[in-house]
């Protein structure tokens, strides 16, 4: 597996990441954990150490599958990237970010997230709620 340094973080991530948006799901539109967890673990066993998910993937159950899959591994060597929706002013409020972060951490059953990304960020929301002093990320 080829690994590259992720930006200025110093973390070496696999050039091939595992996107967890299309994991097997049941008729209830929830992740099929019995199928998904072994698939994720097989990817990790083959050298993939970067897993991408998001708050809304498969009705939020993608993060649960990722969390269960990574439990069997050294967490310092498997990197999880997830996304929080911030497409409107309501989503960009600090208390909403905190609420969603708490949900994500619970779903992943992890004390931390390696990489968090803005999902659906508009320029209006960025300038109004994120880039200003004392903003959501301040």
Where are these regions (language model features)?
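Generic structural signal for helix capping and beta-alpha/helix-loop junctions
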Residues: 25, 60, 87-88, 125
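Non-cysteine beta-strand/loop elements that form the S-adenosyl-L-methionine
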Residues: 15, 19, 81, 110, ...
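Generic beta-strand or strand-like secondary-structure segments
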Residues: 65-68, 83, 96-103
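Active-site beta-loop-alpha junctions enriched in small/polar residues
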Residues: 21-23, 54-56, 83-87, 118-121
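Glycine/proline-rich, positively charged
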Residues: 89-138
């Amino acid at each position: 597996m080829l690994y590259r340094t992720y930006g200025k973080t110093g973390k070496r991530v696999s050039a091939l990441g595992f996107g967890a948006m299309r994991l097997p799901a049941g008729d209830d539109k929830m992740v099929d954990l019995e199928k998904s967890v072994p698939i994720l673990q097989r990817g990790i066993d083959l050298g993939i150490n970067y897993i991408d998910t998001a708050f809304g993937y498969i009705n939020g159950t993608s993060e649960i599958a990722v969390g269960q899959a990574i439990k069997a591994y050294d967490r310092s060597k498997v990197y999880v990237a997830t996304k929080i929706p911030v497409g409107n002013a309501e989503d960009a409020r600090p208390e909403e970010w905190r609420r969603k972060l708490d949900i994500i951490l619970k779903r992943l059953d992890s004390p931390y997230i390696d990489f968090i990304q803005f999902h659906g960020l508009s320029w209006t929301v960025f300038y109004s709620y994120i880039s200003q002093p004392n903003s959501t990320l301040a």
